């Protein structure tokens, strides 16, 4: 069986020659050069992904939602009862949550994965990869052991690769877990890897009262001070101040990239997972597509560090993969213009910036 290191070494580089060909093709379509803006750049980015064989296209679509509870909930950093994680996960199996509705609209399947829900019994309908009944309380201990983090990463990578073998060419990531916008899922990871102070990245999450924000900032600061995560080691950061859902999302990103396929990020938690995943393998960054700008406080800090600019700004902070599902039609639109628009040369049109030699080269 392959190790995590083996799989990380299989991540292919983006194909610059395919991207150059895509650029020439797009410049020769029935439009002024660059007039479709970021759609053109997105199509070129997709063309460079080896898993798409040089032609931007979308086959099957999947949103993988990683569900887990967090021991840091005990610190009073979330207002929702911990039981909501299990209840909402079960609702996902019925297709009634936000991500399920948006994914259905986009024609995507939702895979609900239990990586650490705190329930006595497995929940019917969920994919069971549960490591434990919730992560450790990072204000007083690590979230998990390094071995647990590496095993879950490997399991999720393998699951993602299996979906790719079965025809999925576009992935989205999402999460579900009470208290996960605190150190267990985002703020401590972002603070650790970007070097920014917790006060700059900690937000209200799922409507935390503002009078409790100071406690949340203190919890994040204590978690980092106690656990001393190494910002250069993505696995160490996830194991010490992360959560099982964060590890799972990082695994999807690594798995999709290892197949040369795109993965849509969701909101703030997925940015944190992406920061950790990029520390493990910087080669995955060209495969990451930011769906929307999260309304969480530290969102721009995380995205700036990743060098990513979201396609949507809908003031969303639901999580679940809702933004990833919402952005899937944008990916399909980029593929459609690439594959279905006519060419200037076929209509004997010459525009400034376009030449026949360019179009036919």
Swiss-Prot record:
User: What are the BP-aspect GO terms?
Assistant: cobalamin biosynthetic process
Pathway per its UniProt entry is:
Nucleoside biosynthesis; alpha-ribazole biosynthesis; alpha-ribazole from 5,6-dimethylbenzimidazole: step 1/2
Which residues catalyse the reaction? 320
Q: Which Pfam families match?
A: DBI_PRT (PF02277)
PANTHER family xrefs: NICOTINATE-NUCLEOTIDE--DIMETHYLBENZIMIDAZOLE PHOSPHORIBOSYLTRANSFERASE
The record's comment on protein family reads: Belongs to the CobT family.
Source taxon at top rank: Bacteria
Which keywords has UniProt assigned to this entry? Cobalamin biosynthesis, Glycosyltransferase, Transferase
Question: What is the native source organism of this protein?
Answer: Shigella boydii serotype 18 (strain CDC 3083-94 / BS512)
Query: Which is one GO molecular function term here?
Result: nicotinate-nucleotide-dimethylbenzimidazole phosphoribosyltransferase activity
Instruction: Provide the function of this protein.
Output: Catalyzes the synthesis of alpha-ribazole-5'-phosphate from nicotinate mononucleotide (NAMN) and 5,6-dimethylbenzimidazole (DMB).
Enzyme nomenclature, EC number: 2.4.2.21
Q: Which residues form the signal peptide?
A: none
| Name of the gene this protein is made from | cobT
Reaction(s) catalysed by this chain's protein: 5,6-dimethylbenzimidazole + nicotinate beta-D-ribonucleotide = alpha-ribazole 5'-phosphate + nicotinate + H(+)
Q: Which InterPro entries match?
A: Nict_dMeBzImd_PRibTrfase, Nict_dMeBzImd_PRibTrfase_bact, Nict_dMeBzImd_PRibTrfase_N, Nict_dMeBzImd_PRibTrfase_sf
Complex and partners: Homodimer.
The protein's name = Nicotinate-nucleotide--dimethylbenzimidazole phosphoribosyltransferase
């Amino acid at each position: 069986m392959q190790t995590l290191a083996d799989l990380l070494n299989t991540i292919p580089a983006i194909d610059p020659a395919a991207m150059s060909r895509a650029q020439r093709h797009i410049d020769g379509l029935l439009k002024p050069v660059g007039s479709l803006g970021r759609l053109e750049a997105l199509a070129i980015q997709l063309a460079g992904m080896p898993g798409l064989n040089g032609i931007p296209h979308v086959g099957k679509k999947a949103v993988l939602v990683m569900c887990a509870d967090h021991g840091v909930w005990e610190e009073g950093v979330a207002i929702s009862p911990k039981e909501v994680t299990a209840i909402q996960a079960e609702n996902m199996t019925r297709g009634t949550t936000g991500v399920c509705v948006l994914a259905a609209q986009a024609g995507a399947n939702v895979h609900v994965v239990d990586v650490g829900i705190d329930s006595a019994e497995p929940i019917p309908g969920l994919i069971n990869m549960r490591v434990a009944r919730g992560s450790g309380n990072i204000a007083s201990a690590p979230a998990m052991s390094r071995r647990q983090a590496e095993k879950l990463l490997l399991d999720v990578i393998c699951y993602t690769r299996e979906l790719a073998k079965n025809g999925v060419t576009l992935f989205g990531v999402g999460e579900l877990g009470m208290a996960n916008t605190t150190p267990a899922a985002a703020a401590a990871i972002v603070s650790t890897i970007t070097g920014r102070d917790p006060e700059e990245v900690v937000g209200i999450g799922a409507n935390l009262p503002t009078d409790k924000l100071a406690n949340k900032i203190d919890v994040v600061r204590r978690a980092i001070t106690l656990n001393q995560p190494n910002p250069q080691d993505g696995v160490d950061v996830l194991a010490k101040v992360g959560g099982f859902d964060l590890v799972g999302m990082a695994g999807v990103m690594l798995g999709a990239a290892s197949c040369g396929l795109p993965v849509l990020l969701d909101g703030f938690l997925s940015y944190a997972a992406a920061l950790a995943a990029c520390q493990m393998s910087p080669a995955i960054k060209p495969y990451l597509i930011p769906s929307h700008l999260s309304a969480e406080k530290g969102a721009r800090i995380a995205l700036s560090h990743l060098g990513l600019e979201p396609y949507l700004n809908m003031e969303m902070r639901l999580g679940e993969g809702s933004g990833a599902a919402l952005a899937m039609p944008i990916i399909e639109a980029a593929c459609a213009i690439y594959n279905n628009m006519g060419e200037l040369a076929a209509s004997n049109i010459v525009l400034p910036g376009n030449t026949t030699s360019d179009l036919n080269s």
